[in-house]
Amino acid sequence: MKLILLGPPGAGKGTQAEILNKKLNIPTISTGNILRAAVKNGTPVGLQAKAYMDAGKLVPDEVIIGVISERLAEADCQNGFILDGVPSTIPQAEALEKVGITFDAVVSLEISDEEIVERMGGRRVCASCGAPFHVKNLPPKVEGVCDACGGKLEARADDKPEVVRDRLKVYHKETAPLKDFYAARNLLKTVENQPTVAETTTAILKALGL
């Protein structure tokens, strides 16, 4: 199954993607991770991306789409994948269509702005392996310690309320219009935020008919 996960920052896309890739046995493809991997591996589009990143510039859509196309051509993506964080704009969605990348469903996680602000204040990330946690919704077994690798859990600077509100403004302007874009293609599955991570996963699987 080829999926896109949509939703505002802090909606739990990363957490749900990790759960779904284990349940469905398909990889999660996040923009940040594949950009870093392409740069590290020195692929042609990775080198292009590195030039922009080193200059402190935004990586243009055509390079991002190139990196994604490169990643989706790998063997582990042939039975499906989950895209997290891309497309983030209508032009990116159109570019994916143009290069022939198709999807079975687009899941939009729905949650209010106020709940996002509260939720993101409780997020923690492992400084060593990047595993996500939350002080309330997904706490580690030992406070401040990563379950996976024993690394130190940290709050992110961009989870401060004023920063979150700015990011939400960008989301509503740039990314939220993708819901109409994919609804017009009969791909959109809307999933309301649930009280727990597990309940949200169940709602996603139900929306997908799984």
Question: Model features per residue range: what roles?
Answer:
Residues 1-210:
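Glycine-rich phosphate-binding loop of ATP-dependent small-molecule kinases
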